[in-house]
Amino acid sequence: MEALVYTFLLIGTLGIIFFAIFFREPPRMVK
């Protein structure tokens, strides 16, 4: 069970970092 918790925390941390960078520096998407 601990492995599941650690995996969840790892994904959550990576998600927070990703969104922080994403919103701080908006991507330049060209349609």
Swiss-Prot record:
The protein's matches in InterPro entries, at most eight in alphabetical order, are given as: PSII_PsbT (IPR001743), PSII_PsbT_sf (IPR037268)
List the Pfam families hit by this protein, alphabetically.
PsbT
UniProt keyword annotations, A-Z: Chloroplast, Membrane, Photosynthesis, Photosystem II, Plastid, Thylakoid, Transmembrane, Transmembrane helix
Q: Where in the cell is it found?
A: Plastid, Chloroplast thylakoid membrane
The question of whether Membrane is a record keyword is answered with yes
What is this entry's stated membrane topology? Single-pass membrane protein
Family statement? Belongs to the PsbT family.
UniProt-listed PANTHER family: PHOTOSYSTEM II REACTION CENTER PROTEIN T (PTHR36411:SF2), PTHR36411
Q: What is said about its interaction partners and assembly? A: PSII is composed of 1 copy each of membrane proteins PsbA, PsbB, PsbC, PsbD, PsbE, PsbF, PsbH, PsbI, PsbJ, PsbK, PsbL, PsbM, PsbT, PsbY, PsbZ, Psb30/Ycf12, at least 3 peripheral proteins of the oxygen-evolving complex and a large number of cofactors. It forms dimeric complexes.
**Identification of the protein by name:** Photosystem II reaction center protein T
